[in-house]
Amino acid sequence: MSEIKKVATRDSYGNALVELGKEHDDLIVLDADLAGATKTGMFKKAFPERHWDIGIAEANMTGIAAGVAACGKVPFMSSFAMFAAGRAYEQVRNAIGYPHLNVKIGATHAGISVGEDGATHQCLEDIGLMREIPGMVVINPADDVEARAAVKAAYEHVGPVYLRFGRLAVPVFNDEATYKFEIGKGIVLKEGTDVTIFATGLCVNETIEAEKMLAADGINAEIINIHTIKPLDRELVVKSALKTGKVVTVEEHSVIGGLGSAVCDVLCEEAPTKVLKIGINDVFGESGPALELIKKYGLDAEGIYKKVKAFVK
């Protein structure tokens, strides 16, 4: 049996930027002294004149990106999620969101999988923050194939886009030959009748593995990959919830404001359903090896399996 390929989606981001850079001269990449970590260094090596390192000044980088977009170019500004969505939030809101400028935000090192960097760098609130900005598209890809497709789709979309990437190498489960990405459209990975599990980001693969354990217990779960949290695929969410009658959401993010909240916003209006939100429960993260933290917070396959089983039974 061949070894499962693993790639960090931040690497996918860097590779996708290089490929886009070959095709589009209007692509400008900005970074805040983190080109090695965000992987925009790949773009810098290929197109040094179109890679601008602003230094540790994320608010300034955001304003510059807004200006670049106003001049007709397509900027991708890059930093850790904690800094892109956290430190520079006011500028993202007012300089990019309010005038609805065509800026793409590549936010890496999101969630607890940042690992040893600890709570100060483990951004668990970014999806919620970005969802609140009118007109902002929010994408959280699950693997290398999806992440590279998402970067391309973000370039083609006219308007602000927040792309969430991780530090941890995760399994590549999508088939590049057949995979199709569309902003705002969820993907049914497996149909089921007993419960729907909506997952996003690195939690998608863990949910796929959890489903195998659930199946062994006679629980027929429907698994849906929600790569775009805003705009959410309302039609698919409602259709699946009505079909199974029970809903679970799984995310490497606070249960407040993220995928779970987005799904509940839709269901309370269109299809009231019992929902279990699996994520980070209103606490800060902590320092530790990424895989150990994922297990501790119940976001690994076994943790998801146990919570869903108890919920369904």
Where are these regions (language model features)?
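Thiamine diphosphate
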Residues: 1-164, 169, ...
